[in-house]
Amino acid sequence: GAHYIDLADGRRFVCDFPAAMQAAFAAAGRTAVAGASTVPALSSAVIDHLCAGWQRIDSIDICIAPAQRAPRGQATLAAVLSYCGLPIDVWDGGRWQPHSGWARPSPVQFQRLSPRLGAVCDIPDLEIFPAHYRARDRVTFRAALEVGLAQRAFATLATLRRWGVLPHPEKLAWLMHHAGGALDFLGTPLGGMVVRVAGADAQGQPRRRAWHIAADNDHGPEIPCMAAILLARQLAAGQPLPTGAHTSTSLLPLEAFAPEFAKWGMVTDVVEE
């Protein structure tokens, strides 16, 4: 049998993968990793780094901010439109609450990018991290498009779906994919990501920290591939990974990503807030 690594970011696929595949891969003595991508592989590596030694984590807020001019695919657009306006279970206020996908965008601040509006998206982290990190208050994930008009268009589609006017916004993926290029002149090749955490450090003192990455020259789409590349290199070098089926959560340290960031000229910052 062979080892298995994927870059999936579908919440149900990634979260259900370990239980569904554990027996088969454990019996074969092989490793299977789902979601070896920006989320939850890189996002968990960042949280592990920011919160090392902390007594507790209260909140985790993640936002990905793609560059308007970066390459984008119609299939990806269809996938995100599929839950636009649908309720997403989010750990918020210490309990599970429904948040509407892509609705009600709110401001997000970045270290090296201009402020953007970000809206809730459905990813594995929302389900994995509350238990994995025992987050007391909330775990959120937002996507922040560079052009505000595009972000508000998604919010409008979410509203239309909630009203029952547009039950299948994913059918507009082809149109929006081609129309999106008309907005490229309003954007830049600069994208990024921020992970914010709050909690109590090793001394029990309140702490708020943030990790930022900025990817210029339309290199942002290289980030989702990095975790899979790093894990594949480990296997090729004979370095053991846990047998059985797993998500990529906390399988890689943040330091492992540093050479990949440098290769593409990406800049990271850790900020005490």
What is each residue range found by the language model?
Residues 46-51, 129, 227-235:
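Buried hydrophobic packing segments
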Residues 159-273:
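C-terminal active-site/capping subdomain that shapes the small-molecule cofactor and substrate pocket
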Residues 3-4, 32, 268:
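Hydrophobic beta-strand scaffold residues
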Residues 8-31:
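Rossmann-fold NAD(P)-binding glycine/threonine-rich loop
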Residues 42-46, 122-125, 223-228:
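Catalytic-loop motifs flanking and including active-site residues across diverse enzymes
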Residues 2, 9-12, 37:
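Short, ordered loop/turn segments at secondary-structure junctions
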Residues 28-67:
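Adenosine-phosphate binding glycine-rich loop
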Residues 52-199, 205:
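Active-site-lining helix/loop region of Rossmann-like oxidoreductase modules
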